[in-house]
A protein has these predicted regions:
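Secondary-structure boundary/capping micro-motif
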Residues: 1-177, 181-185, 190-202, 216, ...
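Conserved active-site loop/cleft motifs that coordinate metal ions or position small ligands
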Residues: 204-205, 226-229
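Catalytic phosphate/metal-binding cores of nucleic-acid and nucleotide-processing enzymes, i.e., regions
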Residues: 210
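Charge-patterned, long linear interaction tracts outside catalytic cores
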Residues: 230-250
């Protein structure tokens, strides 16, 4: 059992995720408290298991959080977003944002589906509206029939929201300024992404392999809010249900 636990820690699973995954799959496991005790005992012996734990620092505002001069034309407020999006009962409602590299150079576009917490990540050479809209469209086009809405903050990088909405056949909404809690899942995801790409990381050195690795790790971690299923499991199940439903209607 401990061999499995240590393997999952190496995959950046938290002790609670490991314990919950054991229980959810009917396997004999250990409590998350016992895992923490083993980690700290290992640290006292000079071990390195503690390095697998996520850093619990006080959240700071993201760089550029207040670079919101001017108004994006034709914005649609989150206040007009259907209530079903808040309920998280419909598959295909997405949140989006950007994560900035060191010295504000280059960025990552991050998207997550609200019901499954499934995330998509793309690197952009600059945080321009053109580059960001290209990335969003590229990421979501394979799932275009499962994109009902997209909600972002008021960053100017989302100025081409009408192009994104038109291309994907989706509705685009903007959260209130400085109200990150209105996109809580995406904000949380960005914090997890920083585990792989810290604030001091220069994004010009990031490869597609690095991004694929981060997405794989994040989408294959069991989540307590998903009954300790992984985002990948929930997303793929919903995707298959959607496609089967469409097939039956044709």
């Amino acid at each position: 059992t401990w061999t499995v636990v240590e393997a999952k820690l190496a995959e950046t699973w938290s002790p609670e995720q490991i314990s919950g995954h054991f229980k959810a799959n009917g396997q004999a496991g250990v409590s998350h408290e016992a895992i923490y005790q083993r980690i700290y005992a290992d640290k006292r012996r000079g071990g390195t298991l503690h390095r697998t734990l996520r850093c619990q620092k006080t959240r700071k505002k993201r760089y550029g959080a207040r670079e919101r001069r001017g108004t994006i034309p034709n914005q649609v407020s989150i206040e007009q977003r259907p209530a079903i999006v808040d309920a998280r009962t419909r598959f295909g409602d997405w949140e989006g944002d950007t994560v900035i590299g060191a010295a504000h150079q280059q960025a990552l576009v991050t998207l997550n589906e609200r019901t499954s917490r499934y995330c998509l990540i793309a690197h952009v050479p600059a945080k321009t509206a053109q580059a960001v809209s290209d990335a969003v469209i590229s990421l979501l086009t394979p799932f275009a029939d499962c994109v009902h809405t997209l909600t972002t903050d008021n960053g100017k990088e989302f100025a081409q929201h009408e192009r994104i909405a038109r291309t994907l056949g989706a509705d685009f909404f903007f959260a209130h300024p400085y109200a990150s809690w209105e996109r809580g899942a995406n904000e949380n995801m960005n914090g997890l992404i920083r585990q792989f790409f810290p604030k001091k990381c220069r994004f010009d050195s990031i490869t597609q392999k690095d991004i694929a690795h981060a997405m794989d790790r994040l989408n294959h971690r069991p989540r307590k809010c998903l009954g300790f299923k992984t985002p990948h499991e929930v997303f793929m199940t919903q995707l298959h249900l959607r496609h089967n439903s469409v097939a039956l209607q044709t």
